[in-house]
């Protein structure tokens, strides 16, 4: 079976409501998407870093419990695993996020996972735009491109981290160029291209290498932009009560759909609008499942059904490819 390689931050989020802590959970769309994908029976590796402290143990244990391969997580003995305190906004206000972290000088010294043709590499977060992790991360991403993998990029970074977007804009544009598929939310796009509509941002910055862009919004259906193609799903995008679960689930569902429908790097460009709608249907279904979950991942029952469907479908693909033609 083809593999998923997820490259992103390891962070523990703590949610506060009315100034009081409500719960702590593993943060990040990439880590949570990896957990769902592995739970659905797909070989999934997480490439990341965290300290050997108790917080790092919580994150690694969470991934292990969901069957994620954690051998490519660099456990540094100096410093502390990142923490994010999320203070829920009230009366329509945005959440306020305070980030904590203490890092060693030598970072992201990870063990590279095996990457084969048509594997799927998912990357994004602060690692993909800021030094010192970016240089090593992009070495791995460029290697994945050389190996013939499908590369999926999630622009944006942890809200609450402040730096001038102009400083990292060349890195963002390079990431957009190397990716086969880009998935971003309204807020991500507004922070990166604040004075442009979605259509303008796609035309001016994304639509250069034949890649596909999937746009998520709190107020509209997920929409595909690819060349002159436009396709959308008929439901509102995000569950406002669990944005992390929804977006992580959508990402996991889209990658699952690529495997289910046997979408490879070679035939991705030929995928028509109806084909993209099938992928979006699968992604939204998984997103709704994860948004309803307390740990932002698919349930055991959902995972079992998805794994069985994928296994049976792959067996049919294999049988049809080996059956002699008359």
Spans of features found by a protein language model:
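Positively charged, low-complexity intrinsically disordered leader regions
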Residues: 1-17
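A short helix->loop->beta-strand "cap" motif at the edges of active sites that frequently abuts
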Residues: 2, 143-150, 207-213
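Conserved phosphate-donor
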Residues: 181-191, 201-240
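Alpha-helix C-terminal capping segments
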Residues: 33-43, 88, 257-259
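Conserved N-terminal subdomain of the carbohydrate kinase-like
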Residues: 14-20, 42-125, 300, 304-326
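Conserved beta-alpha-beta core of the PfkB/ribokinase-like small-molecule kinase fold
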Residues: 120, 125-200
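Short pre-catalytic strand/loop immediately N-terminal to key active-site residues, enriched for Gly-Thr
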Residues: 19-28, 233-246
């Amino acid at each position: 079976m083809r593999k998923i390689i997820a490259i992103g931050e390891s962070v523990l989020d703590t949610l506060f409501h009315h100034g009081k802590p409500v719960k702590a959970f593993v943060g990040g769309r990439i880590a949570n998407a990896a957990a769902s994908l592995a739970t659905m029976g797909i070989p999934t590796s997480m490439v990341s870093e965290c300290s050997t402290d108790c917080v790092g143990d919580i994150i690694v244990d969470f991934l292990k419990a969901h069957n994620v391969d954690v051998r490519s997580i660099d456990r540094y003995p100096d410093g502390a695993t990142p923490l994010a305190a999320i203070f829920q906004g009230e009366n329509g206000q945005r959440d306020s996020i305070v980030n904590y972290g203490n890092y060693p000088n030598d970072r992201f010294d990870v063990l590279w996972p095996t990457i084969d043709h048509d594997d799927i590499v998912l990357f994004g977060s602060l690692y993909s735009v800021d030094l010192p992790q970016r240089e090593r991360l992009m070495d791995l991403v460029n290697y994945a491109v050389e190996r013939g993998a499908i590369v999926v990029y999630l622009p944006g970074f942890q809200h609450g981290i402040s730096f001038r977007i102009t400083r990292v804009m060349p890195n963002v544009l390079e990431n957009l160029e190397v990716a086969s598929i880009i998935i971003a939310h309204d807020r991500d796009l507004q922070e990166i291209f604040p004075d442009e509509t979605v259509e303008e941002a796609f035309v001016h910055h994304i639509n250069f290498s034949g890649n596909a862009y999937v746009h998520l919004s709190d107020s509209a259906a997920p929409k595909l932009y690819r060349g002159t193609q436009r396709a959308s799903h008929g439901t509102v995008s995000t569950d406002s009560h669990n944005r992390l679960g929804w977006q992580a689930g959508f990402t996991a569902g889209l990658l699952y759909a690529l495997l289910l429908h046997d979408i490879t790097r070679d035939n991705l460009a030929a995928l028509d609008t109806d084909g993209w709608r099938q992928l979006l249907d699968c992604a939204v279904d998984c997103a709704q499942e994860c948004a309803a979950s307390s740990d932002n991942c698919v349930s055991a029952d959902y995972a079992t059904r998805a794994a069985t469907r994928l296994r049976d479908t792959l067996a049919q693909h294999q049988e049809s490819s080996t059956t002699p033609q008359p």
